[in-house]
A protein has these predicted regions:
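Short active-site oxyanion
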Residues: 50-54, 79, 162-164, 219-221, ...
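Asp-based phosphoryl-transfer active-site loop
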Residues: 16-31
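Conserved acidic, metal-coordinating active-site core of Asp-based
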Residues: 107-109, 113-233, 245
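Non-catalytic pre-domain segments flanking phosphatase-related domains
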Residues: 1-20, 38-44, 48, 216
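Mg2+-dependent phosphoryl-transfer enzymes with acidic/Ser/Thr/Gly-rich catalytic loops
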Residues: 12-17, 36, 196-277
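Short, hinge-like loop/turn segments at secondary-structure boundaries
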Residues: 70-74, 98-101, 138-142, 205, ...
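Active-site phosphate-binding/coordination module
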Residues: 37-137
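Short, structured coil segments at secondary-structure junctions
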Residues: 78, 86, 180-183, 236-237, ...
Length: 277
């Protein structure tokens, strides 16, 4: 099928925007956090066919790998839009078009829990991502994402907007966070920690803001993800694709399950829908 028309059981559609999670979707843990060659080729083709390629991640800008921020040969202008911090900040080359910080009182409540020793955490603001201390759980995440978090006094950080917290609690311990942060959305993509974002923020809301900014509709979208925090995004977009290495809830929310990130998953799915040659 030519161009970016795709025909499925739901009919013929014109896909004009593709949204990609980063960890486990674009980047592989098995290849030193690099984008597989087949995915690079697929992204180049997708853009050549007129499809906007957008990032939709829990990561902040400061934690985006160079290949995501700056692009790569054949994909030199980087991505067309960046939905970061689980939808709390969205921007493109023209600037920030969506900015949703956590309410100050709610942020203070979370920091009090950290100071009381309930759990360790990360704090995400415009300047970067910081930890309250470099505990073993923090170091484990650093190894997973190839990034070292600077230590910051969270109380001092409250002088400016906070967009997301990450609480180092297991799924069984998650109630320790939800009990005191019931007015926030709590998601996770691994067992090590959960993300805490404003109730007015999410990956789908970030996509909605991006579509409005680009002048596109929800019916013109495809999304790729692998984590539990991608499930709502996969359900929201016209076509949701879960990676073969995805969590069960991500797969349940998807229209199509492709192969693993390391097994040409993105390229195979785009080819399945006729979006690349």
């Amino acid at each position: 099928m030519l161009g970016n028309e795709t025909k499925t059981q739901k009919g013929t559609r014109l896909i004009k925007a593709a949204f990609f999670d980063i960890d486990g979707t674009l980047l592989s843990d098995k290849t030193n956090h690099l984008i597989p060659a087949s995915t690079k080729d697929a992204l180049v083709q997708l853009r050549q066919h007129g499809v906007k390629c957008c990032i939709c991640s829990g990561r902040p800008t400061a934690q985006l790998p160079w290949c995501i921020k700056d692009g790569f040969p054949g994909f030199d202008d980087a991505f067309d839009a960046y939905i970061t911090m689980t939808g709390s900040m969205c921007y493109d080359e023209s600037g920030v078009y969506a900015d949703v910080p956590i309410d100050h009182e709610i942020a203070c409540r979370f920091v009090k829990c950290v100071e009381d020793g309930m759990f360790d955490a990360l704090l995400l603001n415009r300047n970067g991502v910081f930890c309250n201390r470099r505990s073993e759980k923090v170091r484990e995440l650093e190894r997973m994402v190839a990034f070292e978090y600077p230590v910051l006094d969270f109380s001092e950080a409250l002088n400016e907007p906070v967009y997301q917290f990450c609480a180092f609690v297991s799924p069984d311990e998650e109630h320790e966070v939800s009990d005191v942060m019931s007015d926030c959305i709590i998601t996770r993509w691994c067992d090590l920690f959960c993300d805490v974002v404003p109730s007015t923020s999410s990956k789908p809301k970030g996509i909605e803001a991006t579509l409005k900014h680009l002048g596109l509709s929800r019916e013109e979208t495809i999304a790729f993800g692998d984590g539990g925090n991608d499930a709502t995004m996969l359900a929201y977009c016209e076509i949701g694709v879960a990676m073969g290495n995805a969590t069960d809830d991500a797969k349940a929310s998807a229209d199509y399950v492709t192969t693993d990130v390391d097994k040409d998953g993105i390229a195979l799915a785009l080819r399945h829908y006729g979006l690349i040659d």
